[in-house]
């Protein structure tokens, strides 16, 4: 069976939404019964985004196999059913690292190592190797056509048409068609120049997807078709919409999936997008609104919490409520009035993070939620600060802290993971990184099994006793100090396979106060939601009703 390759590039400006378009197209092709996967090619020289600042790069998306990847992989998993792995994200840094290792081993037999053929051959081999079991591989090329960083990737995908046959390769170019308000015109010239730039590299796009503030009319499509040498049927108008989950429907309405199937000579049934129609319907017809506060330290760039934001919206869909999100800088809570800043919230969520900055503000938010019976959801560090707060103010451990912040505190209720060996059979896997900064030396990454206590609120929401969730942390609850905390009313309701780690906590004397060491947001999708997020939003709705009633 031949694999069909679809390459998606972007031009004119960055941030046009290549990831959303790629994922949306993949979802439509998947709905036609095709086995689909996506690979993101990133031009940055970092090996992975694991140590990049969330304020600069956005969130790090964790795959089931423990890879720290680009946030676009989160989009892919939310749109299609195929789970991403470390092989679905390839960076320039990873490529160069592998090429240099091969050179040092002598694999190139003394050849002068160059971009062409060695780097481009590595890229092509990566794509071919990791797409063998699929009908269609979509490849999103990061960056913008014309950037020097993207040239090796563009050369590699140009060569793919020769290596795997032009009939099994298709090039999609995403461009901007700006609207000039003074003249009331859509301008196609930037698109023409972007295609010209792509042609200079040797790539003739087969499909143009044109982003704009307005619907691109018939005359503009004819003009783009003529000057860019692309069929008019293959000029797709993609105007701004209020929901990214409308994109699959918009692509299907313009016949893009049918055009692609005919191009590849694929005989498959029409896509059934009824589930996406339901998502959009629920989004457009909410029964009410709840307000959730996200207390974080990276709020200058909300993409740092992309999966959390999406998971909250998914939970809103399942509850038929619109979720209004308020971002609260954790540092501000340390100096300003907590009551004023958190007033009017129906629920408080504290997401993950690293480092001491803003931690005391997060602790104050957990205390405020606990004392005022406001639904609280702590994720990773958010769980840890909830435990620290409870230990300090309920148990009486005034000096309680994490050894991440205070190494010699009297009550290290959160301490570094130590003494466990890395295994490959899901027994509390610890990833040991050699020759890197100490901050990543003992990171627990990827999907792990968790056993839930029967009858707990968490177990009732999941509806089962064994779950698999994704982790990214190197500090854990100190079991030796937890018994006293649990006796005071903060229970451990989820444990790792060998009971080495407490993964979930619940506050007994609170309507909904839950902390998870794992990151449930990475398993949430618009069509299914996630049990913890759905339960959290439901609790926020109940809290709102209670406040209104009183």
From Swiss-Prot:
Per UniProt, what is one GO molecular function of this protein?
glutaminase activity
Reaction equation(s) it catalyzes:
UTP + L-glutamine + ATP + H2O = CTP + L-glutamate + ADP + phosphate + 2 H(+); L-glutamine + H2O = L-glutamate + NH4(+); UTP + NH4(+) + ATP = CTP + ADP + phosphate + 2 H(+)
> Which first-to-last residue range defines the signal peptide?
none
The alphabetical list of record keywords is: ATP-binding, Glutamine amidotransferase, Ligase, Magnesium, Metal-binding, Nucleotide-binding, Pyrimidine biosynthesis
**One Pfam family this sequence matches:** GATase
Binding-site residues, ATP = 15-20, 72
InterPro entries recorded: Class_I_gatase-like, CTP_synthase, CTP_synthase_N, GATASE, GATase1_CTP_Synthase, P-loop_NTPase
Entry annotation: catalytic residues:
380, 519, 521
In terms of SUPFAM superfamilies, this protein maps to: Class I glutamine amidotransferase-like, P-loop containing nucleoside triphosphate hydrolases
Q: Which GO terms describe its biological process?
A: 'de novo' CTP biosynthetic process; pyrimidine nucleobase biosynthetic process
Q: Where does CTP bind?
A: 14, 147-149, 187-192, 223
Residues noted as binding L-glutamine in the record, renumbered to the chain: 353, 381-384, 404, 474
Print the miscellaneous field. CTPSs have evolved a hybrid strategy for distinguishing between UTP and CTP. The overlapping regions of the product feedback inhibitory and substrate sites recognize a common feature in both compounds, the triphosphate moiety. To differentiate isosteric substrate and product pyrimidine rings, an additional pocket far from the expected kinase/ligase catalytic site, specifically recognizes the cytosine and ribose portions of the product inhibitor.
The UniProt entry, under HAMAP family, shows: PyrG (MF_01227)
**Its job:** Catalyzes the ATP-dependent amination of UTP to CTP with either L-glutamine or ammonia as the source of nitrogen. Regulates intracellular CTP levels through interactions with the four ribonucleotide triphosphates.
- Name of the protein this chain belongs to: CTP synthase
Which gene codes for it? pyrG
